[in-house]
Amino acid sequence: MSYLVTIIAFIIVFGVLVTVHEYGHMFFAKRAGIMCPEFAIGMGPKIFSFRKNETLYTIRLLPVGGYVRMAGDGLEEPPVEPGMNVKIKLNEENEITHIILDDHHKFQQIEAIEVKKCDFKDDLFIEGITAYDNERHHFKIARKSFFVENGSLVQIAPRDRQFAHKKPWPKFLTLFAGPLFNFILALVLFIGLAYYQGTPTSTVEQVADKYPAQQAGIQKGDKIVQIGKYKISEFDDVDKALDKVKDNKTTVKFERDGKTKSVELTPKKTERKLTKVSSETKYVLGFQPASEHTLFKPIVYGFKSFLIGSTYIFSAVVGMLASIFTGGFSFDMLNGPVGIYHNVDSVVKAGIISLIGYTALLSVNLGIMNLIPIPALDGGRILFVIYEAIFRKPVNKKAETTIIAIGAIFMVVIMILVTWNDIRRYFL
C-alpha cells in the first residue's frame, strides 16, 4: 500500500510541476499572439482531449512530463514535405483550408496532390502535381487552415502567429515564463504552509533532550529576549544571534511569568546536509518555537523561506557546474525521476506538510535547472534570443536547429546516465 501512495504522490508532484511550467510558457505565448496548437499533460498516446479555441488540450497515457506546442518554435517540423502524397480541400479563392494526411476523415470535394515544394513558415504554400489533371499547380494556404490527421485538426499558424517571427522581448518572456511560474508556485506553497502552520516566535514550545536549552533549565513557555548582546524580538533573531555567537559560552535572557531571567550556556554546533554537494553549519539552543497565526506575517515568512530555499539550490547548481571544470563532478550530484521517486517515498512518510514543502523546493529546482544555458533547455534558447536582441538578427536557422538537436541528445544521454546511477544507488 505504501508503494501505491508513493507512486500516486510522485505522479501528482511531477505532474503539477511540469504542468505549471508548461502553462507558464503557453500563458505568455498567447499574450504575445503566438499560436499554441496543443497543451499536453503527460506523454505518449492521447487518452482524453478537448479543444478550446485554437488549442487542443490533451491528457496522455504516461504521467511523466508534458509540453506545449508553439507554432514556429523550431522544435517540430511540419508533417508535410516534398515527395509526399496528400489531399487538400480548397475554398472559393482556391486557397488550401485543409491538408489531409490520412484516410480517417469525412471531407468531400478534395484534391489529391503530390507535393513538390512547400513552405509552412514564411510564404505558406504547397506546389505540386494534382491527380485530376496531372499538372503542376501552386496553391496558397489560407490564413485559417488545418492539418487533418487521425480525425484531429491542428491549425496551421500564419507567419505573424509564429514564435520565430516575434520580436526578442515577447520571445524572452515566453521562454522565461516556464521557470517563472515554477518560482511563483514555490512562493505560493511556502506562503500557504506559513498560513497553515503559523509563523515561529521566540517563545519556547518544546525543549529537546540533552541540548543546551534543557541543560540550562529553559522550559516551555519561556520567551527568549536576548542572546549575548543581541536583542530578540522574533524567531529569526535567534538564528541571527546564534550565527554570531557560534559555540562560545554566552548569556541567554528569557521571560517567565512576567520576570526576566538569565542563564549561561554554550550553543551546540550542528551540521545539516542541504544537497548532495553542500551542507550548512548551524548553532542551536535545542528548542522548538511556538507558532502564531497572524494576517500578514505568513506572507513575509513564506517569502523568506522561498529566498532561502532558492539561494541554497542556486548555490548547489553553481557548485555542481563548477565541479565539472574542477574535476569534482559526480553523478551523485544529480537526481533523475528515479531519485525524485526515492525522495518522495521518504517525504511521504513524514506527512502531507513535508510533501508540500518538498514540492516547493523541487519547483524552485526545476525553474533554476531550466535556466542553465544548455541549448535544449529554456536557458539555452534564451541565449539565442539575447543574441538576436544584441545583433538585430536571429541566429542562423540551420545552426540553431543543429545546436538544439545536439543539446537534446546531450540531455537524453545525461538523463539515461543519471537514471541508471539512481537505480544503482537506491535499488541495487
Curated annotation (Swiss-Prot):
<dbReference type="GO" id="GO:0006508">
    <property type="term" value="P:proteolysis"/>
</dbReference>
<comment type="similarity">
    <text>Belongs to the peptidase M50B family.</text>
</comment>
<feature type="transmembrane region" description="Helical">
    <location>
        <begin position="401"/>
        <end position="420"/>
    </location>
</feature>
<dbReference type="InterPro" id="IPR008915">
    <property type="entry name" value="Peptidase_M50"/>
</dbReference>
<keyword id="KW-0812">Transmembrane</keyword>
<keyword id="KW-0482">Metalloprotease</keyword>
<feature type="active site">
    <location>
        <position position="22"/>
    </location>
</feature>
<feature type="binding site">
    <location>
        <position position="21"/>
    </location>
    <ligand>
        <name>Zn(2+)</name>
    </ligand>
</feature>
<dbReference type="GO" id="GO:0046872">
    <property type="term" value="F:metal ion binding"/>
</dbReference>
<dbReference type="Pfam" id="PF13180">
    <property type="entry name" value="PDZ_2"/>
</dbReference>
<dbReference type="GO" id="GO:0005886">
    <property type="term" value="C:plasma membrane"/>
</dbReference>
<dbReference type="Pfam" id="PF02163">
    <property type="entry name" value="Peptidase_M50"/>
</dbReference>
<keyword id="KW-0862">Zinc</keyword>
<dbReference type="GO" id="GO:0004222">
    <property type="term" value="F:metalloendopeptidase activity"/>
</dbReference>
<keyword id="KW-0378">Hydrolase</keyword>
<protein>
    <recommendedName>
        <fullName>Putative zinc metalloprotease SAR1238</fullName>
        <ecNumber>3.4.24.-</ecNumber>
    </recommendedName>
</protein>
<keyword id="KW-0472">Membrane</keyword>
<feature type="transmembrane region" description="Helical">
    <location>
        <begin position="352"/>
        <end position="374"/>
    </location>
</feature>
<feature type="domain" description="PDZ">
    <location>
        <begin position="186"/>
        <end position="269"/>
    </location>
</feature>
<keyword id="KW-0479">Metal-binding</keyword>
<keyword id="KW-0645">Protease</keyword>
<dbReference type="InterPro" id="IPR036034">
    <property type="entry name" value="PDZ_sf"/>
</dbReference>
<feature type="binding site">
    <location>
        <position position="25"/>
    </location>
    <ligand>
        <name>Zn(2+)</name>
    </ligand>
</feature>
<feature type="transmembrane region" description="Helical">
    <location>
        <begin position="172"/>
        <end position="194"/>
    </location>
</feature>
<feature type="transmembrane region" description="Helical">
    <location>
        <begin position="309"/>
        <end position="331"/>
    </location>
</feature>
<dbReference type="InterPro" id="IPR001478">
    <property type="entry name" value="PDZ"/>
</dbReference>
<keyword id="KW-1133">Transmembrane helix</keyword>
<keyword id="KW-1003">Cell membrane</keyword>
<dbReference type="InterPro" id="IPR004387">
    <property type="entry name" value="Pept_M50_Zn"/>
</dbReference>
